[in-house]
Amino acid sequence: IMVDEYQDTNTAQFQLIKLLAGKYKNLCVVGDDDQSIYKFRGANIYNILNFEKEFPNAVTIKLEQNYRSTQNILNAANGVIANNVGRKAKRLWTENEEGEKIAFHQFETGFDEADYVAKDIRSKVREGMYHYGDCAVLYRTNAQSRLFEERFITASIPYKIVGGVNFYSRREIKDLLAYLKTIDNAMDDLAVRRIINVPKRGIGATTLSRVQDYADENGLTFYNALKMAEEIGTIGRASAKIRPFVMLIQSMRSKLPYISVSELLQEIIEETGYVRELEAENTEEAQQRMENIDELISKAVTYEESEEEPTLSGFLEEVALVADIDSVDETQDYVVLMTLHSAKGLEFPQVYLAGMEDGLFPGFGAICAEN
């Protein structure tokens, strides 16, 4: 019985392995406790850490020679991973050359970091040192891609998100931007229709179709037809479900002269219960979506700080410039943006590790966890 990537096995798989190999002990596992990164999927690190206790007659062979990396990279990796508690001692080495030294740069803000990476990539490509496709930017969470996407678009650097979607194409971002568009002028029927049932208000497809018919017959926008729902005889009592949505939008509009875009976003999130629903889900995906929402608020704050007279319309225009550009070059020569989890097993000539901050890389939850 052979098991690969043993550090990623879960408790149920371990029990199955014990049952299958219990009698004859004809078991060979290959794994590396230093590469255990899938706890959120149920992986149990103790399966590999306690292997010799479960199978005391096992022969352990350390595979410490590395064929991919340079010695400088391995020295840095060895120095970092040596701080892990309870790991199986090992030190990687290679017969490859020492290679370039790892460059360390510290920045005041995430924007400065993304700006540096964009300029450095452009410089190296112009000098013929690398192609765009040789470069990768790695980060801890998908929410961190936003700053790099915006800087790359501004600098005309082709890029591709691997293992995810572009920041402004993510569901929660499109939902909140649709709210902002509706509050701004409500002329965008697609935006209004997107959020009419976000969160769920129990307004059925038939009702929405009849509202659209009324709008078409009377030359109205979809939102203005919603405002007149009580006059649409064909929808009956469903108008009572529409009223709270219209009142919410009108209430937000009345606050526009007095609050900033970031404050408006927070009001929308609070009034709709958007984040509360995600918190109740209590999943890894929900956590990522909440991080994306925080990043959108950060984008709004950055916009407000950079403009003398920030407005909701101005913010939406700035976002549209970024969101509407398809930045993947058909030549396939593009910079790759991805999380560390997506990057496992891949290699690139030029790699940028972004956001290496306390509480972010590794995550705050990982630092505080007992195991």
Regions found by a protein language model. Name each.
Residues 1-5, 9, 13-16, 20, ...:
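Structural preference for long, well-ordered alpha-helical segments in enzyme cores
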Residues 1-2, 11-16, 29, 39, ...:
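Accessory N-terminal region flanking or inserted into the helicase ATPase core
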Residues 1-50, 65-69, 268:
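Conserved helicase NTPase motor core
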Residues 23-26, 32-34, 55-60, 98-102, ...:
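Short glycine-/polar-rich loops that comprise or flank the Walker A/P-loop
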Residues 31-34, 41-45, 65-67, 77-78, ...:
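A short beta-strand-to-loop transition that corresponds to the Sensor-1 phosphate-sensing loop
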Residues 34-41, 68-69, 161-184, 196:
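Short alpha-helix plus adjacent loop in nuclease-associated cores
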Residues 56-59, 64-158, 181-185, 239, ...:
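Helicase P-loop NTPase motor core
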Residues 145-157, 170, 177-371:
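Conserved helicase C-terminal RecA-like lobe
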